[in-house]
Curated annotation (Swiss-Prot):
The modification Phosphothreonine is found at T15. One of its GO terms (cellular component) is photosystem II. The chain crosses the membrane at residues 69-93, 134-155, 178-200, 255-275, 291-312, 447-471. GO terms for biological process: photosynthetic electron transport in photosystem II. Residues 1-14 form a propeptide. NCBIfam families: psbC (TIGR01153). GO terms for molecular function: chlorophyll binding; electron transporter, transferring electrons within the cyclic electron transport pathway of photosynthesis activity; metal ion binding. It comes from the Eukaryota. It is found in: Plastid, Chloroplast thylakoid membrane. It comes from Illicium oligandrum. The lineage of its organism: Eukaryota, Viridiplantae, Streptophyta, Embryophyta, Tracheophyta. This is Photosystem II CP43 reaction center protein. The gene is psbC.
Length: 473
């Protein structure tokens, strides 16, 4: 018969901060953990830990629903989304809900529905969280062995990993289904300035999809962040979804190999550190994606990227001065290079001036003016459309630069608008959170390894200075 470790709440791999092993209670004396390490009390109480996780999910979903409705209530259809401090509606718009040609919002009802659905879901999760935290069984091993676990049980842990991977794979396929069958998604590259369309011709070629992973991360290459058509993005989700589901099935059906059993630490704190490390990587990648990529994060909703705003400024003044009679092909700038156009070191024609550093920008309002050797002079003279001028002028004055007190835009741009771009918020927040998660990964990895090696003692709580101080109250 399997030993029920849950009946012995404390076992050697998990490290206590003092030697007390008495059961029950919520204080330091009975649990071995001070108030600030409250989660640690639940390490071996699978039922209570389930309650904590479900309640946490409820809080997250409640925030999503409430914030969603808050943004709907404050939304002004006449202004671009990125001028209104919105961080949720741009995601819904990118999925093709409520928008039409050019990214114009034609119906806010889907956004309202999204908010209400999240609020209802959060109530269900909140009830489940409170039930499992207060009323449900403390441990699940005895009554519900399928949901029970012991942190040291390697086979059960990889089964749980497999279930999580399958759920992630299903999530990836939900986006694929939305793009293929349920109204499509917003494509910023659709002719004439973007539109919602169904993705019919998926990119499934492994050489293309995995080619992104093999690219250099630097300018002109840009690793996976350089993806710039929806066929590749949705095709990539097919691959990711399939790999997650197959990998999840594999982890459910197999037991860890001997090398994995030896190499990894098998404790709750170790799994926490692995998870934090993975989330940290996701955060850093998301930061780069939202900052540089204007296909997955269309500029119509998130505002222009930094390079895009800079190139838009060069384009706007090229249009203006060309109308005033300047010969933009040969005009010389203050450094002796071309004032409006110049050649890059590899020979293609790019915008001149300081924006030359952003030569590798690709944007839907600019690409129609390129030829085989970069910007095409005859197209710049004859083919510029009014929507391209309007969009670049708008992006020029909405650079994603700014501070928390909303002094946004380029410091030298007299037409800049006081706003902070959602791109700035999303990139900065994901970088900062990614960094903190990385620090948490190092902290918990160090503790888990030390505990596994048997020399983690923690701080001696019996002689802590605070214990001899006068109570605050």
């Amino acid at each position: 018969m399997k030993t029920l470790y849950s009946l012995r709440r404390f076992y050697p791999v998990e490290t206590l901060f003092n030697g007390t092993l008495a059961l029950a209670g919520r204080d330091q004396e009975t649990t071995g953990f001070a108030w600030w390490a409250g989660n640690a009390r639940l390490i071996n109480l699978s039922g209570k830990l389930l309650g904590a996780h479900v309640a946490h999910a409820g809080l997250i979903v409640f925030w999503a629903g409430a914030m969603n409705l808050f943004e709907v209530a404050h939304f002004v259809p006449e202004k671009p989304m990125y001028e209104q401090g919105l961080i949720l509606l741009p995601h819904l718009a990118t999925l093709g809900w409520g928008v039409g040609p050019g990214g114009e919002v034609i119906d806010t009802f889907p956004y309202f529905v999204s908010g209400v659905l999240h609020l209802i879901s959060s109530a269900v999760l909140g009830f489940g969280g409170i039930y499992h935290a207060l009323l449900g069984p403390e441990t699940l091993e005895e009554s519900f062995p399928f949901f029970g676990y012991v942190w040291k049980d390697r086979n059960k842990m990889t089964t749980i990993l497999g279930i999580h991977l399958i759920l992630l794979g299903i999530g990836a396929f939900l986006l694929v289904l939305k793009a293929l069958y349920f109204g499509g998604v917003y494509d910023t590259w659709a002719p004439g300035g973007g539109d919602v369309r169904r993705i019919t011709n998926l990119t499934l070629s492994p050489s293309v999809i995995f080619g992104y992973l093999l690219k250099s991360p630097f300018g002109g290459e840009g690793w996976i962040v350089s993806v710039d058509d929806l066929e590749d993005i949705i095709g990539g989700h097919v691959w990711v979804g399939a790999i997650c589901i197959l990998g999840g099935t594999w982890h459910i059906l197999t037991k860890p190999f001997a090398w994995a059993r030896r190499a990894l630490v098998w404790s709750g704190e170790a799994y926490l550190s692995y998870s934090l490390g993975a989330l940290s990587v996701f955060g850093f990648i998301a930061c780069c994606f939202v900052w540089f990529n204007n296909t997955a994060y269309p500029s119509e909703f998130y505002g222009p990227t930094g390079p895009e705003a800079s190139q838009a400024q060069a384009f706007t003044f090229l249009v203006r001065d060309q109308r005033l009679g300047a010969n933009v092909g040969s005009a010389q700038g203050p450094t002796g290079l071309g004032k409006y156009l110049m050649r890059s070191p590899t020979g293609e024609v790019i915008f001149g001036g300081e924006t030359m550093r952003f030569w590798d920008l690709r944007a839907p309002w600019l690409e129609p003016l390129r030829g085989p050797n970069g910007l095409d002079l005859s197209r710049l003279k004859k083919d510029i459309q009014p929507w391209q001028e309007r969009r670049s002028a708008e992006y020029m004055t909405h650079a994603p630069l700014g501070s928390l007190n909303s002094v946004g835009g380029v410091a030298t741009e007299i037409n800049a608008v006081n706003y902070v771009s959602p791109r700035s918020w999303l990139a900065t927040s994901h970088f900062v959170l990614g960094f903190f998660l990385f620090v948490g990964h190092l902290w918990h990895a160090g503790r888990a390894r030390a505990a596994a090696a048997g020399f983690e003692k923690g701080i001696d709580r019996d002689f802590e200075p605070v214990l001899s101080m006068t109570p605050l109250n």
